[in-house]
């Protein structure tokens, strides 16, 4: 089993205003991309103009390494299948969550497929992996900013 530091760490010193981010989320008119074929078990993403979150990005020692910022959502009563992508890490900043929503890490016990990204009528091939057989290794509540190891399912 992996050490907790291998999967994620909280970033409590990161300062942001949840209401401002939520308003930015509501007013963002870009299209949602869906990683997968069905709404209820897919991750939905939308790019954010980095100028809107510059005050957050500039809190990092090397803000130039941040190459994109996205909003993520899951559908009400939905789940996101175990997955990984081509990034090494992601910084997740919760805007609207509750303490019953867990982020879970897994160990792959079998094969995976590569879900398409669905953006409107377009399908985009991705290197993301959706795992078919997994074993849970860690669970935590994402109720504050955290850096996640996104190379793990």
Q: What residue spans do the PLM features occupy?
A:
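Non-heme Fe(II)/2-oxoglutarate
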Residues: 1-64, 68-71, 79
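Terminal, low-complexity interaction segments
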Residues: 144-153
């Amino acid at each position: 089993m992996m050490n907790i530091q291998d999967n994620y760490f909280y970033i409590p010193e990161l300062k942001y205003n949840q209401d401002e981010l939520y308003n930015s989320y509501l007013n963002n008119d870009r299209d949602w991309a869906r990683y997968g074929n069905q709404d209820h078990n897919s991750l939905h993403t939308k790019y954010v103009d980095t100028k809107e979150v510059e005050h957050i990005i500039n809190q990092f020692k090397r803000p130039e390494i941040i190459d994109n910022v996205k909003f993520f959502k899951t559908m009400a009563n939905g789940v996101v299948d175990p997955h990984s992508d081509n990034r090494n890490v992601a910084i997740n900043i919760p805007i609207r969550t509750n303490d019953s929503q867990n982020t879970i890490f897994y160990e792959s016990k079998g094969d995976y497929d590569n879900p398409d990204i669905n953006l409107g009528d377009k399908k985009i091939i991705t290197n993301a992996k959706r795992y078919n057989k997994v074993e849970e290794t860690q669970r935590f509540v994402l109720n504050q900013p955290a850096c996640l190891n996104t190379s793990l399912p």
